[in-house]
Amino acid sequence: FFCVYTNNSFVKKWRTIYINTAMDTMRHQWLATYFIPKDVIDEVRYEYGLVRAATVGKESNANWGKKDDTPAGTDTPAADDNVTYINPNITHESEQTEDNTPTAEELEKQAQENFYSVFWELDRTSMEAYLAEHPDTLANGWDQIYINEAGFDDEGTSIQSIFGEQVLAIDAKDGVLLLRISGKGYRGVLAVGKDPSRLSIEMATTLGTAGQLSGTIAEAHNGVLAMNANGFLDPNGAGNGGLLAGYTMSNGTAYGDHFSAYAYKRIELHEDNLFYIKDALSPVSEDCTDAAEFTPALIVDGKKIMDDYWTGEQPRACIGQSENYEILMLVIEGRYPLEGILGTSVNNCSEILLQHKCMQAINLDGGSSAMLWFDGEYVTQSSSSPLRYTGGRPLPNAWVYKKAE
């Protein structure tokens, strides 16, 4: 009785988190309704609605990615103009010989600098130490570096990011970096895709009947990196991923219906290869090519959107874009209390993304749907024990980052 009705700040905080966590699920609402009176639940949900209403209208500035000297309305940045590619043949004039032909040493040095320019997150000292221990890594040049120790049976590399994160994988050709994200009670992976022009939403070929695993969808579309996109209808927890929840767009083709709840958001990928956050009930932009809807928005125009109600420790999936236009895919594992892996809040996800210069980001469907796949294998574990190592639940669609051609 005390825990149900008291206004003690500590108890009230965790009671609110418990109620909202239960009520935001499709099959576990009974965890709240079974023993908590309706009037208490209604009060919590009313306050929840007020907080969600406060996010309505918080949308991305249409010019957020334009350079200071770019005229308004110009469709930039296009990927070819604004993404730094690894090119070992680029040389500076001051580094060339008298006949303007760069030496082999100069080419090697420039290729090295190109690599560190693209993968700016890497701690150079630990990277050089790794290369000294594994010289074959450079056998095909800096632009062909491929390191993958992200699998379930791998321990990761000895390389660190400048933020102290463990590096799990580097794919220089495809422009992909995987980092181990961890903290008190949570563990996950942040994937960084350096070229936003290679991202799209791809649909399950069996949409309407059943879903497919994110890796299956990715492999069908030349993907090297993938994560879940939209949620799906899950009556009694028995959904098979075939019934799309909300609206999505895949390569210019629209599917589903917009969420009618005012608190939902849509993340749109436009022809300029930039993400934009919009209200789900706002018109879809004419130059939108791909989109997904969920809630809440995490970051809009580089500013964290504080959320006082999605504060439970849960498995999370988030997608965003940095000020360098990199695609950020974050998946946090959870629901393994005996291992100390519970999950985290959306606010903490925002902090992780902001550290990587995120400008726009949204929370996606979490739980057992939250999965990250890289180059033929899943690199995060599902929160559902039976599906832990098998790719999680089937999905209606996935964000797919494609291989370099």
Per-region residue spans from a language model:
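Gly/Ser/Thr/Pro-rich low-complexity, intrinsically disordered segments
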Residues: F1-E405
